[in-house]
Amino acid sequence: MTKFTTEEVRSKFITYFKANNHTHVPASSLIPHNDPSLMFVNSGMVQFKNVFTGQGKRPYNKAVTSQKSLRAGGKHNDLENVGYTARHHTFFEMLGNFSFGDYFKEQAIYYAWNLLTKEFELPKDKLYATIYHTDDEAAAYWKKIAGFGDDRIIKIKTNDNFWSMGDTGPCGPCSEIFYDHGEQIYGGLPGTKDEDGDRFIEIWNMVFMQYEQIDKDTSIELSQKSIDTGMGLERMTAVLQHVNNNYDIDLFQEIINFTENIVKVKVEGEAKFSYRVIADHLRASSFLIADGVIPSNEGRGYVLRRIMRRSMRHAHMLGSKEPLMYKLLPKLVDLMGNVYPELKRAESFISSILEQEEIRFKATLERGLKLLTEETETLTKGNELSGEVAFKLYDTYGFPLDLTEDILKNRDIAVDHKGFEEQMLMQKARARKSWLGSGESKTDQLWFDIKEQHGSTEFLGYTLNEAKCKIIALIKNNNLVNDIKEIDTQFLLISNQTPFYGESGGQIGDIGTIFAKDSEVEVIDTLKYLGSIIIHKCILKKGQINVGENANFSIDIRYRQNLRIHHSATHILHAVLHEVLGKHVTQKGSLVAPTYLRFDISHSKAVTNEEITLIEDKVNEIIRDNHEVTTTLMATEDAIKQGAMALFGEKYDSEVRVVKMGETSLELCGGTHVRRTGDIGCFKITSESAIAAGVRRIEAVCGEFVITLMREKDSLLKSIESSFKTNKNELITKVNNILERNKEVEKELEKTLLASLDLSIEQIEKQSAQITGIKLLYKKVGNIDNKILRQAAENLTKKVEDLIMVYIAEGIGKLSITVAVSKAITDKYNADIIAKKLSLFLGGSGGGGQASLAQAGGNDIGKLTNIHEKLYSLLTVS
């Protein structure tokens, strides 16, 4: 049997099916574009789901893919097993061939058998097939094509061999192909009590979609039958490389050996599992970031953070003191970047995110591990860590629950899940209590009913500013009504068509006026719901408005033009950001308002002043070039092939609107735009800031609002000149002189304050209290800077060898604690411990410092009356 590399297995699979007239379809993003039920793409069929359900069409009826997939959240959560078993992964590649109404069972079985035995040269006597127990047709084909006897065809009665998309929809029996690793490995055939062993391994699964489930008890035969198959690349490569563990294949071994050369720990014993975790999680993290996911505390971003932090903990176990994951990225790009070019394009961005996340987590990892050690040192095998401690590790130290479980697994200590969830619910309740909601109570069902009865609203606003439209629904207080009579009443209005743009794609909705026979309605906002219902938020100004009557809808043209200007500017900005900051930049959000624009991007560091200037210059150059702005309707796939930018996670129809601005920008967009880039006038960035880890926000203004901004700045400058009694040419010099003078005054004030806090040895002796052979001196002071208190306390403890000095400074609603201990007695009394305990007593959360000097905070000013007793009890216990 020939030994194949991972790359050769992937290539041969795709080449084989291409030779058999299958279209090679590139892998989709790990983020499902059209399936809100999935967090991540977890199989090859996901990108074809709408084809299988009959809701979409492709220009081909046979396809082959190598699909990047991820299972680390929801139903398919393999995270805790990854690294410890032979075949569990978070990220993996699924090879698959698909038929949409073309070939069916016989041809699918033939393709699989021919590829395995002739192309991959697997011994026929090593292969077995499973079928659904009633699928006699598949059994007959296995006998005909492979020559199998009944002993090699295993009938399975469970749903393991019957696939369905849900309670209703396409479904059908499966046939799986198993490979026998040999009797030297423990395990039994599928369906036996030993089936969970590693001897017989599933290498290919074929789903024969031949039925449609109508309801719980009824299914019918499909007129168009389809095939969905899946072969795990890593599993198949292990078979072809004669190894029984996926982590022993060439791709993983390259990453593991590269890691070993950096950390200098042998790949053996417990370390072996850590190397495997790191290799797997490096792939998952890198591909997720390349597909636009950023570490966060919710949704996909939190799954990514869990994966990253688990790998970082294993790097810590290998003794890595510095960030490690980003150093491994070049090896991964070298191994997989040619097949998945998004890795190469986003390499610098991925590297930056990996490094930053590891630096951030390392700051709390050791403290969290220390707490976990302290809390579990009395626990033995079979005991349980309290949910309260697990939640503290999560909330304070950033330990995902499964990371805590992973750490305790080897000691056979469980975690109190119920207690953890109770703590989580309490936190959410506190958050809800502090949040003032909108109070809206309308139900989704109302909008579904309207859409079902009347269909989508036709948008006329690309070409018309006003139009005659029919009013089909009026909603007041979440209820459908036939008319609106009360002047100044707020209500919602839906029409069969409208020139008003409903807020979507970042562009806010239009405003304007609706005139009926004897009525006038002010439109104060326009929304879009269920993707295609346009809702006018209205106030009745005159007369009465009725369902069924025709009215003249007229948008505010100036308002719309300013929206067009700022929306078109975001497209140009997006293109320029790619050029200036790098191809890794992806849009994470936007707001197009009539007076400004906001654009959120994936970028791991602040945009420099030089970069901002360059971005502004390039955007304004494109504006001055006055490129024509054109819009075209085309198939989504054609638009993507032409290089049109699409947003991750955005749902697109089969036909999309493509907006082109010269040769500068090409994007999928349903918004409204200027006719030529010159209509924008000019562009000016007003702010740049961080809004989350790895996400930056740029705000800017265009056109007349740039002039307004310049006038405001000019007015401000003149006011400052007047206040400083100087002109703009001398302003900087004057301000610098004042700042220098302020520094001198601050130094003088600092000296004065230090002098006022200083005490002689005699004064210390007189004012301090004697406790257990040492001197305690406590002073309550005003809102004095911590730096001064630190210096004053340190000065006093240097004068006397057995002094504990405590300052508590009272500010507005807060307390500042400073504790200093003479170095001669730090073996008995620790300033850091004293400060932390005082902080907790005074309503703080602890502080930090050294044995001789520490500072902390508090906020319970009322407890100061008992501070002497607390200090005495602390020191007598110490």
Curated annotation (Swiss-Prot):
Q: Give the record's cofactor note, including how many are bound.
A: Binds 1 zinc ion per subunit.
Q: Which GO terms describe its cellular component?
A: cytosol
Keywords in UniProt for this one? Aminoacyl-tRNA synthetase, ATP-binding, Cytoplasm, Ligase, Metal-binding, Nucleotide-binding, Protein biosynthesis, RNA-binding, tRNA-binding, Zinc
**From the Swiss-Prot or TrEMBL record, what is one GO molecular function term?**
tRNA binding
Tell me which SMART domains the record gives: tRNA_SAD (SM00863)
Cofactor dependence is on:
Zn(2+)
**Primary location:** cytoplasm
Q: Where does the sequence pass through the membrane?
A: none
Where does this protein reside within or beyond the cell? Cytoplasm
* EC assignment: 6.1.1.7
Q: Which InterPro entries match?
A: aa-tRNA-synth_II/BPL/LPL (IPR045864), Ala-tRNA-lgiase_IIc (IPR002318), Ala-tRNA-ligase_IIc_anticod-bd (IPR018162), Ala-tRNA-synth_IIc_core (IPR018165), Ala-tRNA-synth_IIc_N (IPR018164), Ala-tRNA_ligase (IPR050058), Ala_tRNA_ligase_euk/bac (IPR023033), DHHA1_dom (IPR003156)
Q: What does this protein do?
A: Catalyzes the attachment of alanine to tRNA(Ala) in a two-step reaction: alanine is first activated by ATP to form Ala-AMP and then transferred to the acceptor end of tRNA(Ala). Also edits incorrectly charged Ser-tRNA(Ala) and Gly-tRNA(Ala) via its editing domain.
Put simply, this protein is called Alanine--tRNA ligase
From which organism does this entry originate? Answer: Rickettsia conorii (strain ATCC VR-613 / Malish 7)
Q: What is the lineage of its organism?
A: Bacteria, Pseudomonadati, Pseudomonadota, Alphaproteobacteria, Rickettsiales
